[in-house]
Amino acid sequence: MTAVGIDAIEIRTGKLELDLAETFAPAKGDDPEKYTKGLGLHASSFPDAYEDIVTMGANAAHRLMERKGLTPADIGRIDVATESAFDNSKPVSTYIAGCLEQVFDEDFHHANKGERKFACVAGTQSIDDAYNWIRAGRHRGRSALVIATDTALYARGDPGEATQGAGAVAMLISEDPDVVELSTEQGFGSADETDFLKPNQQFPSVDGKRSVQVYLARMREAVRDFESVAGTIHPDDFTLLPFHTPFPGMVRKAAALAYRHTIRDTEIEEELAEDIGRQPRPEAFDSDEAYVDAMGEYTDELVETDQYRDWYDRVVDPTLEISREVGNWYTGSVHVARASGLKHALENDMDLTGATLGVASYGSGAQAEVHAETVQSGWEDEIAALNVDEQLDNRYSISYEEYEHIHDVHNHDKDTDAEAEAFTPPEGEFVFDGWGRMGERKYRYVE
Ligand code: CAA
């Protein structure tokens, strides 16, 4: 069977940066370490006044196509995953195609376009759709452009405000991919949950503490479901484990449970038993509560062991390096985590060709998905072509007052667009260019 997977990746960050420890924490009267240590975040990315989900997605896709020497004829579908859409009918992919048609000679009239919604897991679902389309043989030799783009804003004063972010990840899904081949095996954990939702409103209704528990519960189901088709997972199976990363502290919790689950009945559990005992087993307890308490105590000790720390530092921590600087990108977050881990490997001269990644996506509402990916021989060139460090370094750092201004500019209920002043000059990129006759958003390319 021909390999199908991710052939190219581009990351586009919002051009503004809010420093959480230096700027946000003092304004909120918080200890900076709540952000840097507790949540694991240093900064958030925000879109400048002329940026939005369309410009970030189109700019990422444009760079990807230019770099790969592609024309619209090479693209058979454009799927956008977002939970920040501004139109309940016309998909964001049409706006992005419209942007790209301004800079390419050909059009995308032949391309199937759509928009995927299931909170943050929709980016992974769009990759799935592209994978299935290619596997079904309906692609006529073409590739799919998958764009995960979000402006993750919370109402001011919401606890989620600390985890905001904005950016897009564009991915090319093709036969014989250069970056990773996707496994056929997948695991799902999906349930009707009300942890985080936006019932026809821009800013989410969030039960933050519960959302953390729902993430863990659905992820646990997805891991078990994956094991039911792919076999029992051992912690050494995966060289990197990119998770959906609303904030790195969330991944720290998920990773501890993943490690605990995958060392059970292995030589690692036996080796650790000398120091911290074996994992509690439910049959040894009279009540669920006593079992859960004992598991909690075991986990607290487990994460302090050298074995766990070594595993975490090698397999999980590298996937969090970009996220720490940009915050939550919702649909793009797990794809940023994958890119971050690969970038770390490249910078540390690791030979990853043939290595296996375990990719764990999550979307509120709620669904987790787990699959494996095999790193392909072209990964180094692809990851070396990313300019994400340059983009991060060039961000304009906003004061708290400027943050409040830009938050208002992007608030759909506030009429600030007319006088919205940008903090950075646009150059060589698509920009928001006002409103059209039917309430549509308009875009133009700035040389
Ligand atoms: N030094 C070190 N650590 C500190 C600290 C300090 N001074 N002060 C606090 N901390 C730690 C806390 O102990 C806590 O860590 P633990 O959870 O490990 O105990 C962490 O920092 C955060 O502190 P709080 O729990 O007090 O923070 P909070 O209540 O203000 O907000 C939150 C946390 C509820 C997750 C909030 O950020 C939120 O609502 N976020 C949005 C929802 C979200 O991202 N949920 C994640 C799962 S859902 C999902 O993944 C989908 C999605 O993308 C939204």
Task: Label the predicted regions.
Residues 1-51, 160-224, 369-447:
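Condensing-enzyme catalytic core mediating Claisen C-C bond formation in acyl metabolism
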Residues 10-13, 81-87, 117-122, 147-153, ...:
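Acidic, glycine-rich active-site loops and adjacent beta-strand->loop/helix elements
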Residues 32-51, 85-143, 149, 154, ...:
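Conserved catalytic cysteine-centered active-site region
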Residues 60-76, 220-239, 256-260, 278, ...:
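Phosphate/pyrophosphate-binding loops at sites that engage ATP/ADP/AMP, CoA/4′-phosphopantetheine
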Residues 76-79, 140-150, 355-361:
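A short, small-residue-rich loop immediately preceding and capping a beta-strand
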Residues 153-155, 199-208, 235, 318-320:
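Flexible glycine/proline-enriched surface loops and loop-helix/loop-strand junctions
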Residues 236-254:
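Long, repeat-rich segments with strong aromatic
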Residues 339-392:
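Catalytic phosphate/nucleotide-handling subdomain of diverse soluble enzymes
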